[in-house]
Structure formats: C-alpha cells, structure tokens
C-alpha cells in the first residue's frame, strides 16, 4: 500500500517537472517594447489601487472626525 502511494507521488512529481520543462522550453525573454508595455500597465494598476484606497480612506477619516470631536 505504501509503495503504490509513493509511486503515485513520484509520478505526479515527474509529470509536474515535465510540464515545467515544457514551459521553460517555449518561454522567451520579453522584448524591450513588451517590457515597457507591461511596466506601464503594472504602474497604472498600482496607481488605480492607490486611488481607490484614497477614495475609501478620505470619507472614513471625515466620518470619524464627525463622530469623535
């Protein structure tokens, strides 16, 4: 029973490593233009999240000031 469980685990690990190898074989380094585009999108996302946090923070701070003088 233990041997079959070990074989199953080893086969799963072997399949995972095979899939990782396949991904690494087809992946490539991004071009400069792709890198710049990814950086812009990431920066825009960070700014958007910061803005949403600010929009949530300001009313809460204002309401706290009204409740506790």
Curated annotation (Swiss-Prot):
Taxonomic lineage of the native organism: Archaea, Methanobacteriati, Methanobacteriota, Methanomada group, Methanococci
Gene Ontology CC annotation, any one: plasma membrane
Gene3D superfamilies: Preprotein translocase SecE subunit
Topology of this chain in the membrane: Single-pass membrane protein
Protein's UniProt name: Protein translocase subunit SecE
InterPro entries attached to this UniProt entry: Prot_translocase_SecE_dom_sf, Translocase_Sec61-g, Translocase_SecE/Sec61-g
Molecular function (Gene Ontology), one example: protein transmembrane transporter activity
Family: Belongs to the SecE/SEC61-gamma family.
Superkingdom of the source species: Archaea
Function: Essential subunit of the Sec protein translocation channel SecYEG. Clamps together the 2 halves of SecY. May contact the channel plug during translocation.
Subcellular location: Cell membrane
Oligomer and partners: Component of the Sec protein translocase complex. Heterotrimer consisting of SecY (alpha), SecG (beta) and SecE (gamma) subunits. The heterotrimers can form oligomers, although 1 heterotrimer is thought to be able to translocate proteins. Interacts with the ribosome. May interact with SecDF, and other proteins may be involved.
Entry-linked HAMAP family: SecE (MF_00422)
Gene that this sequence comes from: secE
Intrachain S-S bonds: none
